[in-house]
């Protein structure tokens, strides 16, 4: 059942998983639902291919917006962040595998607390993080207006 676990971990349907690894849908379903294939070369290859395609790190994979939200909310709340906006390529929906995650937060944290927050988010999302604090930008800055208008509110 490793194949199903990998697919569920990334929130894919069987049809999406089959399409990703380039096999017919019915073949995928048969291999996922039967334990009799679990020791076959083809099954192991399907598991390997799906795992490699869905791997998320700084240079592989694209995060889903729902995953970003559900991962960030508890972290942001634990650091007493009053609001957070996602902006840039992830907010526009045109992120590439090497895209970083751009965030604007309203936070009163500095120094090691700030670095700790950045690192915690980086580890949780497995992507590079560009974290801007609202207090670092001058009021009326066009960047703020653009982020608030076109960004995605996380918290």
PLM region spans:
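Short helix-loop-helix/strand-helix junction enriched in hydrophobic and basic residues
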Residues: 88-90
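Short beta-strand-loop elements within alpha/beta enzyme cores
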Residues: 99
């Amino acid at each position: 059942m490793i194949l199903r676990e990998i697919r569920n971990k990334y929130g894919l349907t069987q049809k999406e998983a089959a399409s990703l690894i380039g096999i017919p849908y019915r073949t995928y379903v048969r291999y996922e639902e039967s334990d009799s294939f679990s020791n076959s070369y083809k099954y192991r290859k399907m598991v390997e291919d799906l795992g490699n395609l869905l791997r998320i790190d700084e240079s592989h994979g694209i995060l889903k917006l729902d995953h970003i939200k559900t991962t960030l909310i508890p972290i942001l709340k634990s650091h007493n962040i009053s609001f957070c906006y996602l902006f840039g390529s992830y907010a526009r929906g045109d992120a590439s595998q090497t895209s970083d995650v751009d965030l604007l937060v309203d936070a009163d944290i500095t120094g090691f607390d700030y670095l700790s927050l950045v690192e915690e988010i980086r580890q949780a999302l497995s992507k590079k993080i560009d974290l801007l604090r609202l207090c670092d930008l001058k009021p009326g800055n066009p960047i703020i207006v653009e982020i608030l208008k076109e960004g995605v509110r996380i918290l």
